[in-house]
Amino acid sequence: MGTVEKQNLILAFESSCDETSVAVIKDGHEILSNVIATQINSHKRFGGVVPEVASRHHIEQITICIEAALQEAHVTYADLDAVAVTYGPGLVGALLVGVNAAKTVAYAHQLPLIPVNHMAGHIYAARFVKPFEFPLMALLVSGGHTELVYMQADGQFEIIGETRDDAAGEAYDKIGRVLGVPYPAGKVIDEMAHAGHDTFKFPRAMIDEDNYDFSFSGLKSAFINTVHHADQIGATLDKNDLAASFQASVVDVLMSKTLRVLKQYPVKQLVLAGGVAANQGLRERLQQDLPAAFPDTELILAPLKLCGDNGAMIGAAGYVQYQHHQFGDATLNADPSLEFDWMPGMLK
């Protein structure tokens, strides 16, 4: 009789912004539980995330989420092999709640502690769809980041292009306020865009520049100026057309840069991840344009339910570090400005 390999169970924490999430992940690719306590209703009246409010909610929810995650997965602390936690980037107060909870569990139950980069977690949300094949390019689009990340192996990240000002998700929320769309605005604007037409032809910043960086501040300004000018002269603008024109500009730039980078960096897979990866307009364009331009590059879209912040993605990224004994200790602290050089040369 052959031996049965032990299953590795990781308890994973995510608290970088406005979701408190704890998950139990088996072998890096199977979700046994993924409990998420969202704070959207608390932040909606402010039109965005208020750090102090976020921290308070994390404190209230973290223990409840831990208990629910273990119960839903039908496991106990004794069954766990490690604890993974987002330690950056994000809101420092919010991060500290998750980091301290994870450190407490790891210490109390003598488990290895795995510090995970939040943005790596977003990429590894796509790992639940299928195994990664390298080299790989990730288009990472979220509220705080817009990046093209090249991976030659698990745990190795090279930023090829990034935003020079506003991230795409940030621009969505800002123009959402102008349109009177409640926070978070991304999903509603996406729906409005599908009902409208690109009639305003907003600028596509940096689309022809010889680099892979992004800029969305000019688009945001053009949008706001268009709306304000209409208000001043008493003109009525179609909000669906405004949304469609804004989204067309964002998607055109993301697509142009992504297809261009794939010419210089041939890859086996392209991963779309991050909160804005839930955008149907962007998903549709990638599904339409990538096969025509790069038929040998496989597109992996992060599952819709895992595009937002969640513990499962942290467990998936953490499992890679677990396999290579990339552990933290009791001195682990939150790093709100953490960048992608978090594991230099892990798999040389």
UniProtKB/Swiss-Prot annotation:
Pfam families: TsaD (PF00814). It is found in: Cytoplasm. Binds 1 Fe(2+) ion per subunit. Substrate binds at residues 140-144, 173, 186, 190, 279. One of its GO terms (molecular function) is iron ion binding. It comes from the Bacteria. Its EC number is 2.3.1.234. Keywords: Acyltransferase, Cytoplasm, Iron, Metal-binding, Transferase, tRNA processing. GO terms for biological process: tRNA threonylcarbamoyladenosine modification. It catalyses: L-threonylcarbamoyladenylate + adenosine(37) in tRNA = N(6)-L-threonylcarbamoyladenosine(37) in tRNA + AMP + H(+). Fe cation binds at residues 118, 122, 309. Signal peptide: none annotated. One of its GO terms (cellular component) is cytoplasm. Required for the formation of a threonylcarbamoyl group on adenosine at position 37 (t(6)A37) in tRNAs that read codons beginning with adenine. Is involved in the transfer of the threonylcarbamoyl moiety of threonylcarbamoyl-AMP (TC-AMP) to the N6 group of A37, together with TsaE and TsaB. TsaD likely plays a direct catalytic role in this reaction. Belongs to the KAE1 / TsaD family. This is tRNA N6-adenosine threonylcarbamoyltransferase. It comes from Lactiplantibacillus plantarum (strain ATCC BAA-793 / NCIMB 8826 / WCFS1). The gene is tsaD.
